[in-house]
A protein has these predicted regions:
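Alpha-helical metal-binding/catalytic segments enriched in His/Glu/Asp
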Residues: 58-59
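Extended beta-strand/beta-hairpin segments
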Residues: 1-53, 64-144
Length: 144
């Protein structure tokens, strides 16, 4: 792992209408725009879907980092995430993220350890730890 602090840089550009290309060195360009709920066209990533995707990805990557040194035998983690935007006194903001995780573990793996590692991943995910929104986690564990 690189020493801290880590820095991540992106650029975005746009005019009065149309899609906004989002770029980061060495990565494919993403075409983004407002979601349909805010008058944008369907079929594009938006800031709202990108943030929600980051929450889901972060849970998986944090779980992976926590499970490896504990030698948990697992084969797959599927996560669906719903981010809820609501009106608050401060204005529009994400108020809740609901994560539903389905974890496939080995026949001899410890289910309680797997569940605890998922809860720990939720707690230690740097994305959700950086946000001011409630995070809920539903867990289903499947044994091989």
């Amino acid at each position: 792992m690189a020493s801290f602090p880590h820095a991540y840089s992106v650029t975005a550009a746009g005019g009065p209408d149309g899609v906004l290309p989002v770029k980061s060195q060495g990565l494919p360009t993403l075409e983004t725009t407002a979601p349909p709920e805010f008058g944008g066209p369907a079929g594009y990533w938006s800031p709202e879907t990108l943030l929600t995707a980051a929450v889901a990805n972060c849970l998986i990557l944090t779980f992976r980092a926590l499970a490896a040194p504990r030698k948990l035998a697992w084969s797959n983690l599927d996560v669906s995430c719903t981010g809820e935007v609501n009106k608050t006194r401060e204005g529009l903001k994400f108020t809740k993220f609901r994560l539903d995780a389905v974890l496939s573990i080995g026949a001899d793996a410890d289910e309680s350890q797997a569940r605890a590692l998922l809860e720990s991943a939720k707690k230690h995910c740097l994305v959700t730890a950086s946000l001011n929104a409630e995070t809920e986690l539903g867990v289903e564990i499947k044994k091989a």
